[in-house]
Amino acid sequence: MKTISNSTLNDHVLLPDYDRSTLKSRIVHLGFGAFHRAHQALFTNEMLSKTSSDWGICEINLFGGEELIQSLRTQDHLYTVAEKGAESTEVKVIGSVTESLHPSLDSIQAVLEKMAEPQVAIVSMTITEKGYCADPATGTLDKNNPLVIADLANPTEPKSALGYIVQALKIRRERGLTPFTVMSCDNVQENGHIAKAAVLEFAQLLDPELRDWIETNVTFPCTMVDRIVPAATEETLTEIAELLGCEDPCGIACEPFRQWVIEDNFVAGRPDWNVAGAEFVADVVPYEEMKLRMLNGSHSFLAYLGYLGGYAHISDTMTDEGYRKAAFDMMMQAQAPSLTMPEGTDLEGYAKLLIERFTNPSLKHKTWQIAMDGSQKIPQRMGGSLRFHLAQGSNFSWLATAIAGWMRYVSGVDEQGNDIDVRDPMAETLRQICDQHGLNVSVVPELLAVEAIFPAELGQNPQVIDAVSSAYQSLIDNGARATVAAL
């Protein structure tokens, strides 16, 4: 079967309905992963179909993903998004990508030169929490991170996203060019502030004058992104190939729902993403807190406790009334009360929509995938609501059970005695603690004492220790399904 390209798509109605030859690489995106393909690049594609804009995207993978970039090049930088509803699938061919680079396929210098080109107005990122080289508990730069150490020692040959951004801004400053906006699109609370803090701290260690120039001239808008995008599987790619009549190794499937809330703070212009459904606002924080706590927090709850309960996919957990009810109750009783939202926000309606999205059987979103990088996610998704309930003296049993589920998961052994492939930047540290205690409740205060995940105000709080210990003991004695059903 042929691969997707301009020539193989000429007989299809799915071609982008705008002139791709007029596009310029005005956006450089770091991290051509599944989420970006189904979200920001798709928003840009739909914006282009509704305007006469020339905002194209240069895609860059810094770590791995060489094959993806090579495939993208062979198919004229076209790829497919399959929006899978419960009963039907809509396939869209995305044409907003103009070119692509990879330091191991091209060169570090080629990447830096692209970022330094005068027409580049935005450098956006989906590099995950760990890509910011930040301490998850404080949000400040982790100066002991090997990538940070390497980039400070050899700044003209960067490895990290921070290193590339700071070096590219240095080049632009030296050439008298305007800077670009740095736009984080990662699922991290106040992602723009975290990106700014990390960039400024890194630049301070490298060149204090450059740091001051960046602070004065560069903007770091916060964004809230939402769309469930499972990792691509062979089944996904086969389905896309059957629908298209040609293969697309860059294809991705996702749910129909999408949301993008953007702080309107750009130093060198921006696309009119609002015509594609994005919202430009003055303050993103309430929206991202709503999403991180209600959606992502319950997603983590379902991931750890669902995996332990033998459920492979989030939609599988929704067939269990105990999990379905516990997820909704967690949203409404543990997370929603901790939020301060603009007037008129319907949190109950939002929670019901989330349950509907989680139930979509077409997505096959693996609990194991969502369970990755828990040490980075838990502070963002549960820390704020935990503080709220401690201050209010209210019930936080759902949060305690979610944290206990994570602790049981990172032990590396499931309820049948099989190994769990724990993927986490702190996996080795966590495994060592778990190995010292075995499946014993004594592990709880030890894991809560890891301040990179749990600040002392939470990890050493007797109420937190007691509640998490109680939930952990229930997981050992009764298993995940019974523990969830009892909530």
Language model features: what each stretch is:
Residues 1-487:
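Substrate/ligand-engaging "lid" and interaction regions
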